[in-house]
């Protein structure tokens, strides 16, 4: 697990339904922590729980992005024969021929793509290739914000230092700190 790459997800019932549809909910379920609401930590030290719903089952779930990704990748590779490549980058993409020029840690090579699912992030070569192509015409706006991942460890006895079943938020003007619980008693925090 790379530092700064494990920001937790807050998963709604739609995400749960997608996991059930994919047949992997039972693998993910032990990783989920229900959060009944948003716990605001105000400047004066007061705390205010804002429930997500009126019923007990109206919750969202905290789940480790890293652990969820491991399950999704393993399922895609083993169950659906998907070939996932890490540490590869796209050098160019020809929209007419659907040909990708790729770079791996070992060599540069070309791929003919019948279909392509891209997750190459900010500065995407694929997005740029479609920049003036109808009907897609994507746009890109790099935000001036950044983030830092932090951790609140579990107590010595393994218990949570904060309320377990809440998404904790410290709103501070242009900055915000959020904390989501993990099954191990710690919290993953993100400072935006």
Where are these regions (language model features)?
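Active-site-adjacent segment of FAD-dependent monooxygenases/related oxidoreductases
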Residues: 4-75
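General small-molecule cofactor/ligand-binding pocket signal
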Residues: 83-85
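Conserved FAD-binding catalytic core of PHBH/FMO-like flavoproteins
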Residues: 74, 88-92, 97-192
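N-terminal Rossmann-like FAD-binding beta1-loop-alpha1 element of flavoenzymes
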Residues: 1
């Amino acid at each position: 697990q790379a530092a700064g790459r494990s920001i937790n997800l807050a998963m709604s019932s739609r995400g749960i339904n997608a996991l059930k549809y994919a047949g992997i909910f039972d693998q993910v379920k032990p990783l989920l922590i229900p959060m009944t609401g948003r716990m605001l930590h105000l400047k004066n030290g007061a705390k205010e729980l804002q429930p997500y719903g009126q019923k007990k089952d109206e919750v969202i779930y905290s789940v480790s992005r890293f652990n969820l990704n491991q399950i999704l990748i393993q399922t895609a590779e083993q169950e659906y024969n998907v070939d996932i490549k890490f540490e590869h980058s796209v050098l160019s993409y020809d929209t007419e021929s659907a040909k990708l020029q790729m770079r791996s840690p070992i060599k540069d090579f070309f791929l003919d793509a019948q279909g392509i699912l891209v997750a190459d992030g900010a500065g995407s070569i694929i997005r740029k290739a479609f920049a003036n192509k109808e009907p897609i015409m994507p746009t890109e706006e790099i935000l001036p914000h950044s983030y830092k991942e932090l951790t609140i460890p579990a107590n010595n006895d393994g218990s949570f230092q904060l309320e377990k079943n809440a998404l904790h938020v410290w709103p501070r003007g242009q900055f915000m700190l959020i904390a989501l619980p993990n099954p191990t008693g710690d919290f993953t925090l993100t400072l935006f």
